[in-house]
Amino acid sequence: MLSRRRGIMPVHPMPKLAKMSGLTPSSPRPTDIRLHQKSRELEIVFDDGNTFRFSCEFLRVYSPSAEVRGHGPGQEVLQVGTKNVGIKGIEPTGTYAVKLNFSDGHDTGLYSWDYFHDLGVRQDDYWQSYLARMKQAGASRE
């Protein structure tokens, strides 16, 4: 049975994502970050030649926060009702990450450069996994 609380629903584990820790000298780093308000997309250009565009919804769904990821295996929470979420602000955190402030009030979780890069490389797989979990839960992005 799924319980509804503040537009979120508990689910089984999300795909494993890159660890937040330990940038190495060879870790890709962004050379440009642009927020496209109208399209609700964040564009990141990395020094390894990759450029990724993320919908704000995708970044909200895959927030690295404990609120979304949980504090251990099996505690992940499926994010529902995020289709129209936007990003209100981006706060740098040292030289390794940013904190995103979403229009729905979510503002926890640090997005490291490694985490962004992993999300970009595997974006299609992660998105399809999210849609499958939504379907299985009978939940809506609206």
Summary of predicted features, one role per range:
Residues L2-E142:
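Motif-centric detector for short Cys/His coordination patterns
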